[in-house]
């Protein structure tokens, strides 16, 4: 699949855009601020995909004043976005320094999935919308997903096999970066290894993998914007992947590249705001 001309063109476009972003003037000294702001914008965008609409200014204020110490605040929308922000901030903590040699250790794939899922779904458990024993724990046996998605969510041995394949793909030493990130995202959507929060965790994994694999090392691309802006295209591409055809999988990978490119454009806007000192109003 990585040799398909459409996939190769998509990956080339992503790498070119990310290279331009990498050498943005704002990231020479203020990359930490840019990553922090990207985590906020990513949480707002991802929340919108999930139906939780919160103003960026509201989340920034909550973060700045340290009010997000509890999983449940009484505002379900804010709680959902805060969980996404916590997960995004966790990813930032695992990113190598953009300037310097710091390279934090990243947990194994199963632990990575569990940690991100706890951040994302913890607020749902705190408010009683999912059971505590579903948080950070993949489905097994005949446990059904609470979420819809493309195709039929597997169960039993099929589910166990899909989850094992997902873990192996995340940890594979050599894999085409864009294809890996795209397939991991798609498997979260279609296999739905958890009872809830699969799509959001899938989008977080894309950000993590593209940074880890060196495609988008700045960690500032906001890849969640595109699925929120054009949800029909997101659903259509996911359905194409779930069809199991090569054409469908290629269409999904190309869609994922488009989402990354939109995220890079948002990162460039973010960098301009950081450089101008107006990023809090971004």
Give names to the regions the model predicted.
Residues 1-282:
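FIC/Doc superfamily catalytic core
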């Amino acid at each position: 699949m990585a040799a398909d001309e459409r996939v190769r063109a998509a990956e080339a476009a992503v790498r070119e855009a990310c290279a331009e972003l990498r050498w943005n003037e704002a990231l020479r000294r203020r990359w930490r601020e840019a990553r922090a702001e990207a985590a906020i914008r990513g949480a707002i965008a991802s929340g919108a995909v999930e139906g939780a609409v919160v103003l960026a200014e509201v989340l920034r204020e909550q973060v700045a004043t340290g009010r997000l110490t509890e999983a449940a605040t009484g505002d379900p929308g804010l709680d959902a976005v805060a969980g996404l922000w916590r997960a995004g901030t966790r990813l930032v903590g695992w990113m190598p320094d953009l300037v310097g040699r710091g390279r934090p250790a990243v947990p194994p794939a199963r632990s990575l999935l569990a940690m991100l899922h706890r951040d994302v779904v913890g607020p749902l458990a705190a408010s009683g919308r999912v059971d505590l024993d579903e948080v950070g724990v993949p489905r097994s046996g005949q446990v059904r997903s609470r979420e819809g998605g493309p195709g039929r969510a597997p169960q039993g041995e099929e589910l166990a096999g899909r989850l094992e394949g997902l873990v192996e793909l995340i940890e594979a030493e050599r894999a085409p970066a864009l294809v890996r990130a795209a397939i991991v995202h798609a498997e979260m959507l279609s296999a739905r290894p958890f009872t809830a929060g699969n799509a959001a965790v899938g989008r977080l994994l894309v950000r993590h993998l593209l940074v880890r694999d060196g495609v988008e090392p700045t960690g500032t691309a906001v890849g969640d914007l595109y699925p929120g802006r054009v949800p029909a295209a997101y659903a259509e591409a996911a359905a194409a992947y779930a069809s199991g055809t090569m054409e469908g999988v290629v269409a999904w990978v190309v869609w994922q590249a488009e989402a990354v490119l939109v995220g890079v454009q948002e990162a460039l806007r973010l960098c301009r705001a950081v450089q101008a000192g107006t990023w809090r109003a971004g």
